[in-house]
Structures are given as structure tokens and as C-alpha cells.
């Protein structure tokens, strides 16, 4: 029996099943309106809420964490500063030279975080931050050896900004306690501890006491500040100066930030709010932590695959449900779960009689990465040959042409939902801040980073289409400039340190 005959299934039944699944992933204009309105409501509640954490309380709203960043750079800043960046998979240490003309020079050491720190629950916070301290010393030894040779009064201290891309309760520009891990980390004893203090202690142990961690930020705020610095006073297409309004990340995770009027941030202590306003500081950058939007699922749709991924495979069940529908970490996992289900229903991969016979990689959570989906998304080759090769290489999984057509339809629906949901917080912020109507033309800039929005084929186009369908409409979408903020977390952390 030939391979194709062995795999032959009821094509009509498979097609019907895929149509049903794709339909469950659709986000139409009405749903965009509904979600955007609720997002604004959750922003308002979050700005007024003084409790800490991300408990699933309907009235709590979004975290809306004050960052204590009260001004934005304009490209004229100068100086040499250090930055450290702990992301979802890598740790970077950077030396950033701000040239004062919207440009910068950077030296960096990037290290892949060892698997044991990501997946082992027995790892302690001391072990993790000791690793960060050792990698920082390796960077200094390579790029700033003069710091290690200096002694006593000859030591010239260097400011460092620390980009920590996880939810923290930030009480000042230079301190913040971890609320909870997201993405891959599971080190429970870090929760509730000041991450700046943990890092500074390990730097001191490594003989790097000349480095002062003076600013705590996250990748999203860093991206926003970096974008503001490099864009300077860029004229818009209408001849006006376009205004930076939002910083956002669409990569392993997703999040956003924006400048909010201090008088609206009721969660700040009254005396602090009064003092800032007296000092002439009228706005503060708010870290939204929008990955946790609608954890109660009051308005977000949930397929059975979303529920399974959250409850069975994610490191933080019940939290960051919005992120689990958008971010690159979960796109491939959603497809993997759908394929396993279609096999269980006897609609695909008929050569494997039961679940146990399926290739190990197809049964392994998070084995199917978004890079594979990106190749499938744009595959227009004869017989979908690129899709066939991608599955053979990534999962050791042979497929028929009918199966590949079904897989491509699923991939396109998964990523379209991701891009459409990504438009919700952007539209909500623009409406809440009235940014599109502040001036005659009202053109705005959105600084972004993350491999999904930067590299995934068609993601930005789908995002723009969703924005046009959202409450801001076609006219609002046309006023938006999407700008890539490369190396945002490193440069942004340095900019935070500069003003500390």
C-alpha cells in the first residue's frame, strides 16, 4: 500500500473539522469593539486599584504598574551606561554609549539561560542571580577590564539599568518585588523579593561593587524609551511631529506601556502624586502587563485547546490568558494541540494507530515553534512542499497533501487571531489617551520589538487590518506609524539609569 493511500482519510470530514476550528478562532469587528471597551474599563480599574499581585478579582482590572519614569528621552542624551536584560530565554549585559544625536553604540554579551534555571523548581533565586552575576563579570572582563583593575579611590562607579521582563510591584525607580513568573521560570522563592537587591548582592560578591543598579525597568518600557530616543523629533507624513505614544512587545511574551496623566493614577500615594505634580511632572509611564487581560474570561473566547494549554501545559495556569492567545511561545503549541486532537478523532495521521505511536516531538509540549508556522504561513509551493519539509524536519512527521492544506488553514487562523487580539490594547490606549485627536493630524508612533511582529510574515498587515476594524476605524489606523525599536531593552534600561 502506498504512503498516500495509507494516509487517505475522509477529506470532507477533515475539512469540516478544520472549518469549525478556524471559525472558533475568528475575531470579528463586533468582538474587537467589545474587547476594546472592556480593556479601557480594566485600565481605569487598574489605575485606581492599590492591591498588589494578579489575583483573579473581577473588579481589580489590569495591573497598571507605575514605573516611576516621568519623562521621555528626545535623542539629545549623552553618556556611557551599563544595562542588563533578563528575558524569557536569554540574559544580556550591555555597555551603551549615547551619542546625543539619536544614535548609540553598544557592546554586549548575550547568554542563553541554561535549561535547569528555566525548568527546575528546585533552583533557588540565589542560584539564578549568582549566574547573572557571573555572566556580568564575564562581560566586564571582556569589554570593561579597566573596572577590574581599578582600586580604592580610582574606582569610577557606573550606573546600570536592569530590564526585568516579568511582573513586579515597583515601589521606586530602583526597586521592585516579583509578583509572579511568566514564560518559563518556576523559581518560587523569588516571588515577593526585591529583584534589584538580589542582583546587586551578586554583583558585589563578584567584585563588581563599582556597578550600581539604579533603575529597574522591563523590556516593554525599555523598548518605549529606546524608540523615543532614536526617533527624536521625527516629522510625520503630514509634516507635523509625530508623537511616540505606546511601547509594545510581541515576542515570546506580549506587553505594552504608555504615558498616563499622574492625576489619573489614583493607586499612587496621595503625597507622592502631589509632590510629583508640584515638581512639574505631569505624566508617568505605566507598565500595563496586558498579558493578564481578562483572566476571568468574561469577554475573551476560549476554545478547548486554549483551556488545555493553560491548565495542562503552561507554567502559570489561570493567568496571562490574553498572552497565551497572542505570544510566540504559544502559537505553535496551539497548533500542536489541535493536531493531536484531530489525530484522536481519526481525521489525520492515520498511519499512527494511537497516541502512543505518534512521534515523540508531536507529543512534547512547546516543541513546535513559531518559526515553523511562519514558513507554513507563506508556503505557496507545489503540493505545499515547504510545509512537508518543515514537519519532517521539526517533528519527524510525514504528511499528505490534504493534511498539509488543513495545517496551513489552521496556521493562518491561529496567527490571524493573534494579530487581531494584539490590536485590542493598542486601540484601547489610543482611545483612552485621546492621542489621535490631540492635534489636527494627530499622527502617532508605536515603538515595537519582538520576533513575532518583526519577523512573522504578514503579522503587521493583519494587525493594521484589525486596527482599521477596531473602534478607531480606518482613519485612526492611517495615523499610526509602527516603528521597530531594535535593542530596545538594553538601550532603554541605560536611558532609565541615566535619569536615576
Swiss-Prot record:
Reactions that this protein is recorded to catalyse: D-glucose + ATP = D-glucose 6-phosphate + ADP + H(+)
Class of the enzyme per the UniProt entry, highest EC level: transferase
MF terms in GO: ATP binding; D-glucose binding; fructokinase activity; glucokinase activity; hexokinase activity
Key words of the record: Acetylation, ATP-binding, Cytoplasm, Glycolysis, Kinase, Nucleotide-binding, Phosphoprotein, Sporulation, Transferase
Induction summary: Repressed by glucose through the MIG1 and MIG2 repressors.
PROSITE patterns hit by this protein: HEXOKINASE_1 (PS00378), HEXOKINASE_2 (PS51748)
Subcellular location per the Swiss-Prot or TrEMBL entry: Cytoplasm
Phosphoserine modified-residue sites: 2, 470
GO biological process, one term: ascospore formation
EC number, as in UniProt: 2.7.1.2
InterPro entries registered for this protein in UniProt: ATPase_NBD, Hexokinase, Hexokinase_BS, Hexokinase_C, Hexokinase_N
Function: Putative glucokinase involved in phosphorylation of aldohexoses and glucose uptake. Involved in sporulation. Required for the full activation of the early meiotic inducer IME1.
Designated name of the protein: Putative glucokinase-2
Species of the source: Saccharomyces cerevisiae (strain ATCC 204508 / S288c) (Baker's yeast)
Gene that encodes it: EMI2
Amino acid at each position: 500500500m502506498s504512503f498516500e493511500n495509507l494516509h487517505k482519510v475522509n477529506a470532507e470530514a477533515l475539512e469540516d473539522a478544520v472549518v469549525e476550528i478556524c471559525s472558533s478562532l475568528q475575531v470579528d469587528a463586533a468582538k474587537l469593539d467589545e474587547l476594546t471597551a472592556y480593556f479601557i474599563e480594566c485600565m481605569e480599574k487598574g489605575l485606581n486599584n492599590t492591591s498588589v499581585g494578579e489575583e483573579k478579582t473581577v473588579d481589580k482590572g489590569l495591573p497598571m504598574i507605575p514605573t516611576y519614569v516621568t519623562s521621555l528621552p528626545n535623542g539629545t542624551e549623552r553618556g556611557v551606561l551599563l544595562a542588563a536584560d533578563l528575558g524569557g530565554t536569554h540574559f544580556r549585559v550591555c555597555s551603551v554609549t549615547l551619542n546625543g544625536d539619536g544614535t548609540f553604540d553598544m557592546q554586549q554579551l548575550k547568554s542563553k539561560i541554561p535549561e535547569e534555571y528555566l525548568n527546575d523548581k528546585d533552583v533557588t533565586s540565589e542560584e539564578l542571580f549568582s549566574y547573572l552575576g557571573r555572566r556580568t563579570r564575564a562581560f566586564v572582563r571582556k569589554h570593561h577590564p579597566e573596572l577590574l583593575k581599578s582600586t580604592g579611590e580610582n574606582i569610577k562607579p557606573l550606573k546600570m539599568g536592569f530590564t526585568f521582563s516579568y511582573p513586579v510591584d515597583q515601589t521606586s525607580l530602583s526597586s521592585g518585588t516579583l509578583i509572579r513568573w511568566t514564560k518559563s521560570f518556576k523559581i518560587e522563592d523569588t516571588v515577593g523579593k526585591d529583584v534589584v537587591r538580589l542582583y546587586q548582592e551578586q554583583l558585589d560578591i563578584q567584585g563588581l561593587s563599582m556597578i550600581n543598579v539604579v533603575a529597574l525597568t522591563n523590556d516593554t518600557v525599555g523598548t518605549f524609551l529606546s524608540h523615543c530616543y532614536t526617533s527624536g523629533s521625527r516629522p510625520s507624513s503630514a509634516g507635523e511631529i509625530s508623537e511616540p505614544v505606546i511601547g509594545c512587545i510581541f515576542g515570546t511574551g506580549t506587553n505594552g506601556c504608555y504615558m498616563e496623566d499622574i492625576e489619573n493614577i489614583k493607586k499612587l500615594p496621595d503625597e507622592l502624586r502631589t509632590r510629583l505634580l508640584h515638581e512639574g511632572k505631569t505624566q508617568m509611564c505605566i507598565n500595563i502587563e496586558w498579558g493578564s487581560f481578562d483572566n476571568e474570561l468574561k469577554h475573551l473566547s476560549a476554545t478547548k485547546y486554549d483551556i488545555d494549554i493553560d491548565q495542562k501545559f503552561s507554567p502559570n495556569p489561570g493567568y496571562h490568558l490574553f498572552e497565551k492567545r497572542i505570544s510566540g511561545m504559544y502559537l505553535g503549541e496551539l497548533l500542536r494541540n489541535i493536531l493531536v486532537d484531530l489525530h484522536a478523532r481519526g481525521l489525520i495521521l492515520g498511519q499512527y494507530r494511537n497516541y502512543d505511536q505518534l512521534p515523540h516531538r508531536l507529543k512534547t509540549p512547546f516543541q513546535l515553534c513559531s518559526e515553523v508556522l511562519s514558513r507554513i504561513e507563506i508556503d505557496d509551493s507545489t503540493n505545499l512542499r515547504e510545509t512537508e519539509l518543515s514537519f519532517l524536519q521539526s517533528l519527524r512527521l510525514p504528511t499528505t497533501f490534504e493534511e498539509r492544506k488543513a495545517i496551513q488553514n489552521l496556521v493562518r487562523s491561529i496567527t490571524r487571531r493573534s494579530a487581531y487580539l494584539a490590536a485590542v490594547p493598542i486601540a484601547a490606549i489610543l482611545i483612552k489617551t485621546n492621542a489621535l485627536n490631540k492635534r489636527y493630524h494627530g499622527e502617532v508612533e508605536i515603538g515595537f520589538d519582538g520576533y513575532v511582529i518583526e519577523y512573522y510574515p504578514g503579522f503587521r498587515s493583519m494587525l493594521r487590518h484589525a486596527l482599521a476594524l477596531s473602534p478607531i476605524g480606518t482613519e485612526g489606523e492611517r495615523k499610526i506609524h509602527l516603528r521597530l525599536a531594535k535593542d530596545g531593552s538594553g538601550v532603554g534600561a541605560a536611558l532609565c539609569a541615566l535619569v536615576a
